[in-house]
């Protein structure tokens, strides 16, 4: 039966149900603490790597009665009122938007397919990052290095790991011995010599929406003990259809098996020209849009797929906006605020339906808010 909602519910913020992803190996406590869950028994002694602040499968609290409603059912109840007529016309009712808060300490060398190109089952996944604190990542390839040598190094590591994995599973080699042999090989071929290793600054923007650009998060526990703290916005595509791993950094699963790698496809997808691998083309800082009456608005992402602004509001000040052209997603990164009768709490996400139209946010304390919306 279709969900039936009165107009008042479609003119109020819908808080998105927390969806935290536990990651014992590379997560941390940042997300737990930001959301005020540090004393929760559920998260005692645990590490979280990501929280999904919006996804196709998201659930939301109905502002009328606090019942939980799926995003799909909410949209189906009145697509134009929820999403906005311009969004429906340009993007349709299936909003493939994924917004994540991430704490990560290293992942594989990856690449995503560029728009307009085809390769097997792979699909593009435009995404962009906003660094909340300093971190470490790799991005793009070095053009003064031999791509053939890079290719040979990755194939050599991958072939060796597959062989060692078979030996561990067959009982000929211990897992520790396989790890040691792998690390010795990685040190000897040094795949990092072929890619740009970048120290991220707080408030740095990384735009990966073009696709075809090598990237990875890195780990340096001495300089960056919290890893990479990143706010991500991306098109919602499952990893198995978009993330090509070229190098998984010598990681074995506990039984000696490996995560899937796709070295040939990864190498075939990387853009090798100077323009695509020019860091200044993809890395930037916030741009001021407006500042008045205690409220500052900065542009973070401007892409064909999604936009992201940061709104900073001084304590006691108000910020005015208009969602009538398309829904807004608000994530409260710092502080607390009030929107009508709804308290906007730090660490929480809210969907502002298009039917809300003009709305005012009053900061009860100094607040920082990320606003994601679609370019219409």
Regions found by a protein language model. Name each.
Residues 107, 111-115, 133, 304-323, ...:
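Conserved short histidine dyad/triad with adjacent acidic residue
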Residues 179-242:
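Loop-centered beta-sheet repeat module
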Residues 195-207, 338-360:
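Short acidic-glycine-tyrosine-enriched beta hairpin
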Residues 261-325:
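Functionally critical, mid-to-C-terminal surface segments that flank or help form catalytic/ligand
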Residues 98-100, 107, 120-121, 127-130, ...:
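His/acidic/aromatic-lined binding-pocket segments of jelly-roll/cupin-type domains
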Residues 1-174, 238-239, 246-281, 308, ...:
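Transition-metal
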Residues 102-106, 114-115, 123-124, 133-136, ...:
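Ligand-binding loop in jelly-roll beta-barrel domains
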Residues 172-189, 323-331:
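Short, basic/aromatic beta-hairpin or loop at an interaction surface
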């Amino acid at each position: 039966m279709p969900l039936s909602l009165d107009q008042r519910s479609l003119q109020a913020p819908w808080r998105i149900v927390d969806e935290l992803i536990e990651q014992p190996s590379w997560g941390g406590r940042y997300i737990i603490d930001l959301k005020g869950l540090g004393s929760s028994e559920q998260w005692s002694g645990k590490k979280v790597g990501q929280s999904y602040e919006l996804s196709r499968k998201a659930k939301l609290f109905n502002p009328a009665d606090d019942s939980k409603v799926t995003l799909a059912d909410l949209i189906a109840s009145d697509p134009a009122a929820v999403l906005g007529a311009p969004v429906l016309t340009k993007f349709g009712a299936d909003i493939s938007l994924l917004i994540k808060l991430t704490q990560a300490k290293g992942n594989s060398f990856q690449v995503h397919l560029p728009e307009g190109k085809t390769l097997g089952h792979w699909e593009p996944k435009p995404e962009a990052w906003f660094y909340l604190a300093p971190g470490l990542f790799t991005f793009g390839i070095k053009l003064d290095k031999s791509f053939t040598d890079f290719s040979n190094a990755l194939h050599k590591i991958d072939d060796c790991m597959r062989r060692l994995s078979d030996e561990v599973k067959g009982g000929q080699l211990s897992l520790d011995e396989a790890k040691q042999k792998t690390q010795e090989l990685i040190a000897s071929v040094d795949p990092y010599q072929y890619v740009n290793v970048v120290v991220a600054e707080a408030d740095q923007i990384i735009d990966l929406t073009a696709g075809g650009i090598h990237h990875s998060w890195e780990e340096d526990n001495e300089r960056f003990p919290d890893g990479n703290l990143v706010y991500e916005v991306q098109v919602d595509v499952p990893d198995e259809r978009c993330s090509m791993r070229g190098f998984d950094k010598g990681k074995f699963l506990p039984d000696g098996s490996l995560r899937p790698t796709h070295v040939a496809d990864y190498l075939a997808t990387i853009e090798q020209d100077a323009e695509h691998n020019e860091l200044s083309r993809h890395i930037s800082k916030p741009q001021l849009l407006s500042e008045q009456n205690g409220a500052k608005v900065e542009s973070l992402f401007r892409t064909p797929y999604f936009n992201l602004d940061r709104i900073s509001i001084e304590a006691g000040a108000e910020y005015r906006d208009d969602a009538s052209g398309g829904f807004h997603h608000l994530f409260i990164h710092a502080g607390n605020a009030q929107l009508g009768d709804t308290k906007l709490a730090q660490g929480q996400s809210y969907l502002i339906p298009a039917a809300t139209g003009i709305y005012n946010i009053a900061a009860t304390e100094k607040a920082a808010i990320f606003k994601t919306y679609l370019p219409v």
